[in-house]
Structure formats: structure tokens, C-alpha cells
Amino acid sequence: MNPASIIFLAFAMSTDAFAAAVGKGSAMLKPRLLEALRIGLIFGVIEAITPVVGWFIGQAATQWVANWDHWIAFSLLLLLGLHMIYNGTRQQAEAEEEKPRQHGFWLLAVTGLATSIDALAVGVGLAFVNVNIWVAASAIGLATMTMVTLGVMLGRAIGTVMGQRAEVLGGVVLIIVGSRILYEHLSAVA
């Protein structure tokens, strides 16, 4: 696999995480660049690990991964999205002080994992291609970290303009991303 293909793959793998990061950034109280970098690092590390895990699983698990990855990603993103919509529509004051300054590690890790399930399947496929998995995983992780950091900062701008409705929008985005993953896999099977 040539370097251009690896870079293209890396950024393609980061698009779901970018969309989720916009939602996360909009749901926070004016996240600073350092917080955006922390979120980017968490997502980037998870996104770098999953193709390596997939690569080690190899062809033996290809059928299982192909049959279930989309359902797992859809379910996690649906639940996270519904939770964000619920939080965004609760009957409470829309004061910015109620927004968190940062999201907890486990919430970010679950979101990062949900957006990287497809990278697990890509890792399985990479096991059968002439590619250095460590270079590919590093590129995927760095691209994801960059895109998520930018996504959080974009979400900050959107959140400032939209207020609490931004959290609803973020939840809708997560549900759309999960639905798109499910649709792509189901339409490929049909």
C-alpha cells in the first residue's frame, strides 16, 4: 500500500470521529484547545489500536466482524445520540454553567470505540494487504486526533451560536452516523 493510499485511508477512517467530536464540542462549555487535544488524543489512540486488533484477528474472524460491526457501532451511537438529545431537551435552564467543561474519559472512550468499529474491520482487511500495520495505524491515529481536535473546536463555535440545541444536534449527528454505518453494511449485503 503506497503512502498516499495510507493517508487517504487514515482520513477516511477519521470522518465518523470528526462528526462525533463536533457534537461533543457543542455540548461543552467553551472547550479550550487543550481539552480538544485531550479528546483528540483519546479518539486517536482508540482509532489507532482498533485496526491493529483487527489485523491480529485476521481472516479467521472476518465473517463475525463483517456480520456484527455495524450493529455494534449503530447501537452504541444510537444510545449516545439519544442520551445527548435527552440532555438537550430536558426542562431546565439553558444556562451555560450547566454544560460540562470537559467530558469524562469513559464517555469519550465509548464514543471513540463506537466510531472506530469500522477500523477494526479495516484492520482485518489490512492483514491480507502488503502494508506495515504500524505505519497505517499511526497514520489513522494521527489523522483522527487532528480531525477530532478540529471537530471539537468547530463544535465549540456551533455550540456558542446554538446554545443547548447544539447538544440535540450532536445527538442527531451521532444517530445519523450510526444509521449510515448500518445502512452501508446492510445495503452491501443485499
UniProtKB/Swiss-Prot annotation:
The membrane-topology field of this record reads: Multi-pass membrane protein
Cite the Pfam families for this sequence: Mntp (PF02659)
Task: Provide the protein's localization.
Answer: Cell inner membrane
Q: InterPro entries, alphabetically? A: Mntp/YtaF, Put_MntP
Alphabetic keyword roster: Cell inner membrane, Cell membrane, Ion transport, Manganese, Membrane, Transmembrane, Transmembrane helix, Transport
Transmembrane regions: 3-23, 39-59, 65-85, 106-128, 133-155, 157-177
Q: What is its main location?
A: membrane
Which GO molecular function annotation, any one, does this entry have? Answer: manganese ion transmembrane transporter activity
Q: Which GO terms describe its cellular component?
A: plasma membrane
Q: Does the keyword Ion transport apply?
A: yes
What's this protein's function?
Answer: Probably functions as a manganese efflux pump.
Family per similarity comment: Belongs to the MntP (TC 9.B.29) family.
Q: What protein am I looking at?
A: Putative manganese efflux pump MntP
| Organism of origin | Pseudomonas fluorescens (strain ATCC BAA-477 / NRRL B-23932 / Pf-5)
